[in-house]
Amino acid sequence: MAKGVFERTKPHINVGTIGHVDHGKTTLTAAITKVLAKHVPDDPANKEVAFEQIDNAPEERQRGITIATSHQEYATKNRHYAHVDCPGHADYVKNMITGAAQMDGAILVVSAADGPMPQTREHILLARQVGVPYIVVYLNKADMVDDPELLELVEMEVRELLSEYEFPGDEVPVVVGSALKALEGDEGELGEQSILKLLEALDEYIPEPKRDIDKPFLLAVEDVFSIQGRGTVATGRVEQGKLRLNEEVEIVGIRPTRKTVVTGIEMFNKSMQEAQAGDNIGVLLRGIKRDEIERGQVLAAPGSITPHTRFKAEVYVLSKEEGGRHTPFFSHYRPQFYFRTTDVTGEIFLEEGVEMVMPGDNTVMEVQLISPIAMDEGLNFAIREGGRTVGAGVVTQIIE
C-alpha cells in the first residue's frame, strides 16, 4: 500500500534502456541510480538500486536475460525520470513494444567492444515504430577497447544506423564510458564522469514532452490484480488527460463497455489525488471483479473513445533483412495486431488490384479484428506473427 504522498516538483520524463542483449543495459541502469544517489542525494527519488534488483524478473534466473520490464525512478537537479529497463532478447520483443511505447526518449546502449549487433538494429527500428522521439547513445565497455580509432568507428556505425531509421544520426549525443566501472565506484572519465555526462545529455537533448493533458483521460491497462478488502487495481501509463479521485471512467475494448468509479490512485506506492499524462499509476476500481477487466482494455473518460473491429491502415512490412517475413502475404492473411498492450488476431484485406504485399513494401490495407479495440485514427500498432514483428502500421480510417 501507499508509503507517503507523491510530490510533483520537477518536470517528469519517461526514459528507458534499449540495445542488444548483454551490452550492459541493466548495469547502466544500476550505475545511474548509484551515481545520482551520490550527486543529488537530497531528492527522495534517488536510491541506489542493485543490478540484481533491476534484473529480478522470475524467468530471469535460469537464462541471464532480462524478461520483464523493470521500472526505476531517479532525479537530476532539473528533472524527475521514470526509467524502464527494456528486455534485450528477441524472444521478448513483445515486452519491449509495451515498454518502449512509454518513452519520451531512449538510451541506446551499444558495447564499444562489439559494435552494433542484430538486436541493436531491431530496437532502433522498434523505437521508430512505436514512436520513441529521441535517442541518446551510451557506448559501453569502452574500457575494453584500447584503440581510440576503433571507438570512433563504432560511433560512426551507430550514427549511420540511427540515420537509416530516420533518427538524426549526426546530432544524437554519444557518450563513451563503462557502466561497470561507474558501478564499481570508479570516479574517472569512463566511470562516474561518463554517467554524469549521459545524464546531462538526457536533460539537454530530450525536450520536456508536450503532455496531452488537455485531451480526455486515457490509460491502457497493462496489468490487473486484486487487493484483499479493497478491490481490483488496474495498472498502466496515463496516455492523455488527467484523472482525479472519485471520477467516473469507462472500461473500453474486448468486452462490452462498462462504467466504474476510481476510488484510489497510486504512483510509486504513493497515493495521489490526481494523475496526469505520462504517469505510471495503479487505479482502484469500484465494483469491478478481478476477472472483469484485462490487459489490452483501456480506462477512458466516459464517451471519449469507442471500440472498433474494422479499420483502414497504412502499413510498412518489414524486409527479410530487418527480421521480417521472407515471403509475400495475400488477402485473408491472419496475423496478430499489437495495439498498446495486447495482441488481437485480425484478417487483412488488400486493396482492389493489389494481389500481394512483399517484405519491404508500404501498403494500404483494411483489417477486421476478431475482438473490438478502443481506437482513434492515428493509433499505431505492430503486426506480429509467431512472436516476431513483421510490420508496423497506423490507423488511417475507422470503418466499424
UniProtKB/Swiss-Prot annotation:
Enzyme nomenclature, EC number: 3.6.5.3
Keywords: Cytoplasm, Elongation factor, GTP-binding, Hydrolase, Magnesium, Metal-binding, Nucleotide-binding, Protein biosynthesis
Residues the record lists as binding Mg(2+): T26
Residue ranges, annotated region (G4): 140-143
GO cellular component: cytosol
Keyword GTP-binding in annotation: yes
Region listing for G2, in residue ranges: 64-68
Family: Belongs to the TRAFAC class translation factor GTPase superfamily. Classic translation factor GTPase family. EF-Tu/EF-1A subfamily.
Segments for region (G3): 85-88
Protein location: Cytoplasm
Catalysed reactions, semicolon-separated: GTP + H2O = GDP + phosphate + H(+)
Keyword GTP-binding carried by entry: yes
Signal peptide: none
Protein's UniProt name: Elongation factor Tu
